[in-house]
Amino acid sequence: MFVENLRWAAAFAPKQKLTIEPINGVDMPGYFLNDFDLAMDVLAEIDAPNLFLQFDAYHAAKIIGDVLGTWDKVRARTAHIQVGGVPDRAEPTGGDFDYPAFFKTLDKQKFQGWVSGEYTPAGRTEENLSWIS
């Protein structure tokens, strides 16, 4: 049903970029799209020019552990990136993943999609946006 619905949505809104997002099963038990390989298989099966991946680096770290390796495999089909600190979904400024290096990689690769933060700030949001620069 998921594939049929996505196929319909992609055909219904051909000028819109649609995304699907793998989410780790620890944070969202029972969520069926909890694997990047499965997400890429879905994109290949539907083969719609307006259907892309939403790459959440936090979920990649929780699902696979190898964020950069996963990114290399999926970047050609990615339209939107989300970031959040690993392992606690805090600001993407510390923790178990080197976000500054990842952002440099995105710049070097000339990534043209969206990058957004999805995390729980330690304090006021305005005080915790240094990662953007």
What is each PLM-predicted segment?
Residues M1-E4, Y99, Q112-A122:
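Structural motif corresponding to the early beta-alpha repeats
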Residues T105, Q109, T120-S133:
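Aromatic-rich peripheral "rim/lid" segments of glycoside hydrolase catalytic domains that contact
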Residues R7-K15, L43-D47, G69-T78, P100-F111:
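Acidic (Asp/Glu)-rich catalytic clusters
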Residues A90:
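Short glycine-rich, flexible loops that bind phosphorylated cofactors or substrates
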Residues M28-I46, A61-R75, T93-D96, T125-I132:
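Distinct, well-ordered alpha-helical segments
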Residues L18-I20, L51-F55, A79-V83, G113-G117:
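Hydrophobic faces of well-ordered beta-strands that scaffold small-molecule active sites
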Residues P22-V26, A57-H59, G85-P87, Y119-G123:
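Active-site-proximal loop/turn and secondary-structure-junction residues that shape catalytic pockets
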Residues M1-F52, K62:
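Active-site acidic/histidine proton-transfer and metal-coordination neighborhood
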